[in-house]
């Protein structure tokens, strides 16, 4: 479930800084010209019980209207794909990616609905999170519902100065437990192959 909310928040932060500024100034909707986004990421997870943080690497891709791919490459490869309303998850076993049945479709449908709101520029029209703007580059999400708060106590996303693309995500999961993701090699509105969203 946590990776679904992380996935949502990454896509939520895609729109440009002009839309962010408009939302901070009064919640007005902004016209977005987003067609696609790709980036690499490094995820570092800190837990009190661990002597060293857990480090994972991967990539994500998004294409309008609702095609998304979230892929962990190391230490264990897994792929989450959402395309045309369908959700598929693959996990590597014995060197091959195998599809996992029974993915959490209910949660994923909620995520897709939230993504649509954000891509339409509705930054503050959010039923699940209280959204606050720390500065012109940082947005903080505080869960409204206890069900979500039990998993995530708070999230901060930081937008880069160039093109308004995502720089990092900080997920606060409890005392001495947090996850930070840093993004690189970001590209926007490039032509993406259809196969990215149809299979592993």
Q: What do the predicted segments below correspond to?
A:
Residues 15-21:
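Sec/Tat signal peptide C-region and signal peptidase I cleavage site
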Residues 35-43, 56-60, 66-70:
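One face of beta-strands
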Residues 51-59, 82, 156, 177:
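Amphipathic hydrophobic-ligand
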